[in-house]
Amino acid sequence: SNNKLTFLAIVLLLLFHSCTNNNQVKTTPWGTTIVPESESSQKKSTLSLDDIVSNGELIMVTLSGPDTYYDYHNSGMGLQYLLCQNFAEKLGVSLRVDICRDTTEMIKKVKRGEADVIAFQLPTTDRQLSYCGFGIDSTKTKWAVNRKNLALAKALNDWFKPSMLAQIR
């Protein structure tokens, strides 16, 4: 009976101990701070154009739709996607498509450095983004990249020509 009581006390102690929020700063043996994965992903830096080329991948975010991106017999389709694919080919990199729920999610991903380009016609109102590449003058909308990524914005502006639309459509 005494053993059962001791066992129960130990189990309860372990249970309560495991439920406490452990916010201690952890350090490596050589003194650097260990940042939890969730915090380090928040501080991801924007990849420069050179980083994108050396990594061999451009990450585009967009919404699912007939003009943006859709899957047709295991092939990507949609005007925004096809244009971005053309840009990725010009850079000599592959294109990864990340479909987002809404424009807010796309903007967050680009600001956090989780994506390189918003291949979607965004209103040019957010000052933390750089608007570049394919745009529609009548609606004052354009693709966007992180404001810090000037080289990518310039490359997109140098690449896009309105005549491309006729070739893709």
PLM regions and their residue ranges:
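Intrinsically disordered, low-complexity regions
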Residues: 32, 66, 114-117, 134-136
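Extracytoplasmic/secreted cell-surface and envelope-processing proteins
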Residues: 70, 106-108, 127-129
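N-terminal hydrophobic or amphipathic helices and topogenic motifs
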Residues: 2-98, 130, 147-154, 158-169
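Alpha-to-beta junction loops
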Residues: 58, 93-94, 111-120
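Ligand-binding "clamshell"
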Residues: 112, 125-146
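Short helices/loops that flank or line small-molecule/ion binding pockets
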Residues: 90, 99-116
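Solvent-exposed coil/turn segments that connect beta secondary-structure elements
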Residues: 63-66, 102-103, 113-115, 122-125, ...
